[in-house]
UniProtKB/Swiss-Prot annotation:
The gene is TAF11B. It comes from Arabidopsis thaliana (Mouse-ear cress). Residues 42-58 have a biased composition (Acidic residues). GO terms for biological process: RNA polymerase II preinitiation complex assembly. Transmembrane segments: none annotated. This is Transcription initiation factor TFIID subunit 11b. Expressed in roots, leaves and inflorescences. GO terms for cellular component: transcription factor TFIID complex.
Length: 204
C-alpha cells in the first residue's frame, strides 16, 4: 500500500488511484525500491565467484598443457634431428673428404678393382631365381631383391680382396685361381663373415 501525504488516499503500488481532491491526477504511484539484504548479496557473489574461478583454473590448465605439449614437441623434434644426424653421420663435405683420403691411399690395381666393383652387379632375375630355389618360398619383392644383391656383392668383394692378400703373402701374381678363392673363403669363415648353416647336411 502507498500513502499520499497531500490527501488521505491509500492505494496499492500496482493500482492507479484518483481521489476527489485530484491529488494524483491519474498518475501511477511510484514503487519503493527494495534494498538487498547484505547477507543475500554476499551469498550471490559467492555463488557467482566459483564459476569465474573454475573458468580461470581451466584457462590456466589449458595454458600449462599447451606449454607442456610445445616443450615435448620441441624435444621430440630435437631427438629426431639428433637421430638423423647419427644415421647420416657428418655432412656431405666431410664424407667426401674422408672418401677422398681413403681413395688416395689406393694403389692403381686397387683403384681399378674399386671402379669395377662400383660398375658391377648381379642380375635381378638371376638373383630372384637363386633365392627362390634355395628358400622354396614365393617370389620376393623388389626391395628384398636389392638387399640380397647388395649383400652378395659385398661378400664377393671381401672374397676377392682376401684372395689378393693371399696372393701377396705367397708372392704370386696373375689372375686369381681357385686355390686362392678357397683360402680366402676359409679365412672369412674363421673371421665369422660367412653365415653358418642352420640345418646340418644329411649327407657328407
Amino acid at each position: 500500500m502507498a500513502f499520499n501525504a497531500r490527501s488521505c488516499c491509500f492505494a496499492s503500488s500496482n493500482e492507479r488511484v484518483t481521489c476527489n481532491c485530484n491529488c494524483l491526477k491519474d498518475q501511477p504511484v511510484p514503487r519503493m525500491k527494495h534494498s538487498k539484504d547484505p547477507f543475500e548479496a554476499a551469498m550471490e557473489e559467492q555463488e557467482e565467484s566459483p564459476v569465474e574461478t573454475e573458468q580461470t583454473l581451466e584457462g590456466d590448465e589449458r595454458a600449462v598443457k599447451k606449454c607442456k605439449t610445445s616443450v615435448v614437441a620441441e624435444a621430440k623434434n630435437k631427438d629426431e634431428v639428433e637421430f638423423t644426424k647419427n644415421i647420416t653421420g657428418a655432412d656431405p663435405v666431410t664424407r667426401a673428404n674422408k672418401m677422398q683420403k681413403i681413395l688416395s691411399q689406393f694403389t692403381e690395381e686397387q683403384m681399378s678393382r674399386y671402379e669395377s666393383f662400383r660398375r658391377s652387379g648381379f642380375k635381378k632375375s638371376d638373383m630372384e631365381k637363386l633365392v627362390q630355389r634355395i628358400t622354396g618360398g614365393p617370389k620376393m619383392d623388389d626391395t628384398m631383391n636389392i638387399v640380397v644383391r647388395g649383400i652378395a656383392k659385398m661378400f664377393v668383394g671381401d672374397l676377392v680382396e682376401t684372395a689378393r692378400v693371399v696372393m701377396r703373402e705367397r708372392k704370386e701374381s696373375g689372375p686369381i685361381r681357385p686355390c686362392h678363392i678357397r683360402e680366402s673363403y676359409r679365412r672369412l669363415k674363421l673371421q665369422g663373415k660367412v653365415p653358418q648353416r642352420s640345418v646340418q647336411r644329411l649327407f657328407r
